[in-house]
């Protein structure tokens, strides 16, 4: 076998390996917040919206999307509730792990990233935001594959007023 043949063999193996790696897209859904601004004993991700907990809508969106699996990050006191009353009850089969969050959002993201080891691409979503769409998810996956990182934003629709502290 000549050098040219050997080079082609190595290159084709790399392409096959890379194609396998690209399949792994993990969604980390953060649901460890306390929702203190809501002035409620129930964190907003667990409040009922329509017939379901707010968190359900985010999990269902990722369940129905091209992501391969979901890591759910929640508070230590809510792990069993999430497992039994949301994931199992509503058959959210892509949830591979439920991990506890940290004191701050970045701690929860860190714990989710540790649990998502092996994922080539990671989407991070706040479980208290139920209006995520399939288009946003697929556009995010497409963008991260091109640019290595991306973020989602929507145009501001409400009036914004600047208030002078002294008035």
Describe the function of each predicted region:
Residues 38, 62, 82-86, 140, ...:
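Hydrophobic packing residues within well-ordered alpha-helices of enzyme cores
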Residues 11, 29, 55, 112, ...:
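Residue-level signal for inorganic ion chemistry
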Residues 121-123:
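Short aromatic/hydrophobic "clamp" motif used to bind/position activated sugar donors
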Residues 12-22:
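Intrinsic disorder/low-complexity segments
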Residues 56-119:
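Conserved N-terminal catalytic core of the sugar/cofactor nucleotidyltransferase
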Residues 1-14:
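Extended acidic/charged loop-beta regions that coordinate divalent cations
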Residues 3-5, 132-167:
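Conserved core of the sugar-phosphate nucleotidyltransferase
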Residues 23-79:
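N-terminal glycine-rich phosphate-binding loop and ensuing alpha1 helix
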């Amino acid at each position: 076998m000549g050098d040219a043949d050997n080079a082609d063999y190595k290159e084709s193996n790399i392409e096959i390996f890379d194609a396998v790696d690209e399949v792994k897209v993990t969604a980390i859904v953060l649901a460890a917040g306390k929702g203190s601004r809501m002035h409620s004993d129930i964190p907003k991700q667990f409040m009922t919206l329509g017939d379901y907990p707010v968190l359900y809508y985010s999990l269902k969106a990722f369940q129905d999307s091209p992501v391969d699996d979901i890591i759910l990050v929640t508070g230590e006191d809510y792990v069993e509730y999430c497992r039994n009353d949301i994931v199992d009850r509503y058959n959210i089969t892509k949830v591979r792990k439920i991990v506890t969050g940290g004191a701050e959002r970045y701690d929860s993201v860190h714990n989710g990233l540790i649990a998502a080891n092996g994922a080539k691409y990671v989407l991070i979503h706040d479980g208290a935001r139920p209006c995520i769409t399939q288009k946003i998810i697929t556009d995010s996956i497409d963008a991260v594959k091109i640019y290595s990182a991306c973020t989602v934003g929507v145009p501001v629709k409400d009036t914004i007023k600047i208030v002078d502290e002294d008035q």
